[in-house]
Every structure is written in structure tokens, then in C-alpha cells.
């Protein structure tokens, strides 16, 4: 369909593989046309020794487990400086353990099931991998008892793993977040950038550290010291939303002045009476 010249423009949200297939087909058209693509992420959060850990833990939990971790902006990896790593892990485990999982139409439940059996099996496989090669700090189980056994319900999971483990690189799209210790903010940023993706990235730390983080991080959407966690455009009428690298292109913010011009055609008019 995208190869048809009658298609004036395309906005895509989905996997990198499908997105790149679409972009290539679209580029082979008879003339250039606007194309916006959002194609996944492996979103990182950096926590410095100067961070407000309560705020950081709250933001990470909201970002990692909101909508069952099945949103493009979800945090899935955390790099924390060693002096505060133990305290942050304890807070994350505590807050994660308080999450109520169940029927998402009921107000008492904050998290519902994962999308389908494929995601459910991927979760179980990843949790088993972490039990063997890392550590489970909270969760790590499929919820099979009682009425939850009739759906694809899993526990929100906080885990640790060696920094070279494959789960730090692979997009999971699950309620699963890894936490790793680093020696410095600089090392954390290097690890955050060592990914094919670059959609969202968060930072919790001191005011003086913020410019350094924002200058070096490779992500299209950034947030700093935000207790609500990752944003899909906190102010969508004013902020562009989109990624770098394999995460796609910036500019996806419906209704904003960053978005609309990409689907407008300029015409210069000179009229002489």
C-alpha cells in the first residue's frame, strides 16, 4: 500500500523490522513523501549518587510497569551509581511489590495482563534466564493462581544481570526492568548509548549534572527528575515525540507545530495585478 503514489504520507508505530520494510518501500516511490516512523526502544534511566532516590524509584516504577511495560516509552534498564545502588534497589523492590495486578477495568488494580500468549511466554523465558544468570529483586513469576490463571498475568519484575547480558540489549516490551551498578554518570551514559535504539532516556540527579546528561545522551525524548517517569510528550501540543537511531524519527506529536508541517505542502504565490 505505501508504494502506491496516491499515498501522500505515512505515520508508522511498530517494530523496527516492519518499520524499516515500510520505509524502504515508501522510499522507492516516484517522488519524496513525508514519513514518520516510531520503531521501538530499549529505554534507559541513569540515577546518580546525588539523586532524590524516592523520586527516582517512583518514576522508574511508573515508567517500567505502566500499561504492563507495553508502551514505547517504558523504561527497561536502569544504571545507578554504586554508592546509592543498594538503596535504590530496595526502594524499587518495595514499590514493585505494592503493585496490584488483576482485571484492569477495576480501579483497585494498577496492572493488567500482557497482550497475548507470545508476550506471556517471552516473559517466562526471560524470568527463567534471569534466575539462572542474574538475580530477581521483585516479581519474576507468572501469576497462575485463582482467576489470574485464566489470562496472561505476570508479576512486575525488577532484576539484576551482568552488564553484558543480552537482556540489556534486547527489546522485551514487558513489565521487566534491569538494574545495574556503574562507577560514574559518564559510564552510565555510555552504556545507555550503547544500544541500537534511542527513543526515551531519563536522568535523576543533581542540577549541575543535568547539562552533561542532556548533551551526551542519544535519545529523542528525555526527561529529568520527573516523578511520573517516562513521557510520551508531557505537553503533546508543544513537544515533538520520536526516537533516534533504530527507534525511528522525531516529530510524532499529533497536533503540535512540530508534526503538522510534515504533512503540509508549501506553495509560493506571486500575484501581479
Task: Cite the ranges covered by each PLM segment.
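ALDH superfamily catalytic-core signature
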Residues: 5, 9, 17-163, 186, ...
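Conserved C-terminal structural/oligomerization subdomain of aldehyde/semialdehyde dehydrogenase
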Residues: 6-7, 11, 46, 58, ...
